[in-house]
Curated annotation (Swiss-Prot):
Source organism per UniProt: Pseudomonas putida (strain ATCC 47054 / DSM 6125 / CFBP 8728 / NCIMB 11950 / KT2440)
Protein name, as recorded: Octanoyltransferase
UniProt keyword annotation of Disulfide bond present: no
Reaction it catalyzes: octanoyl-[ACP] + L-lysyl-[protein] = N(6)-octanoyl-L-lysyl-[protein] + holo-[ACP] + H(+)
NCBIfam families xrefs: lipB, PRK14342.1
Record bears the keyword Lipid metabolism: no
Length: 216
């Protein structure tokens, strides 16, 4: 059964930690009737450690800050030109288990990439989306009281060099790739629009809307 309307907030370039705190507040304060939201954002350069993160996977962070988070997974990198989507969903209301939610997000990303003639796939033992073994999108979620927060990060048109300062997602030597290198020059706004459509489709929402106002 399709859910009603999925709301999107397009936040532009935002520091990581204030968005993290806003996600937590939204999740703690929402009611059973709250509209599900997805926040689309870019972050200045930052490494984030998941709950399973190990210090040895931070090789040489250097001048890039490291933030400990409460999402699943290990260490990853965020930076300008990477499209991040935070999925603030009532998973219980949607009727999805965690594994199904992850699979639906991966399929949305795979179909998005296919629209650029990029053939991608998921791995059963390593959440995310890959192209010829190189990772193009990372996933890390947290479920609290049946509601999800955190989300996905898609490499679109960014500097990939900082990934070499870590073992991405805890895998030594994991190659990273991005859409620009596979499909040529890319407009981030267009990718954002296509991602919205794919998430609405794969998460079984009837429609979408753009939400205005801040996240404070």
């Amino acid at each position: 059964m399709m859910s009603a309307c999925l709301g999107f907030r397009e936040l532009g370039l935002q520091p990581y930690e204030p968005v993290l705190e806003a996600m937590r507040r939204f999740t703690e304060q929402r009611s059973p009737d709250s509209q599900d939201e997805i926040w689309l954002v870019e972050h200045p350069a930052v490494f984030t450690q998941g709950q399973a993160g190990k210090a040895e996977h931070l090789l040489v962070p250097g001048d890039i800050p490291v933030v400990q988070t409460d999402r699943g997974g290990q260490v990853t990198y965020h930076g300008p030109g990477q499209l991040v989507a935070y999925l603030l969903l009532d998973v219980r209301r949607l009727g999805f288990g965690v594994r199904e939610l992850v699979s639906r997000i991966e399929l949305a990303l795979i179909d998005l990439l296919a629209s650029y003639a990029v053939q991608a796939s998921a791995k059963p033992d390593a959440p995310g989306v890959y192209v010829d073994g190189a990772k193009i999108a990372s996933l890390g979620l947290r479920i609290r009281n049946g509601r999800s927060f955190h989300g996905l990060a898609l490499n679109v048109d960014m500097d990939l060099a900082p990934f070499r300062r870590i073992n991405p997602c805890g895998y030594a030597g994991l190659a990273m790739t991005q859409l620009r290198d596979l499909a040529g020059p890319i407009e981030l706004d267009e990718v954002r629009t296509r991602l919205r459509g794919q998430l609405v489709k794969h998460l079984d929402y009837a429609e979408q809307t753009t939400l205005t106002g801040g996240i404070d």
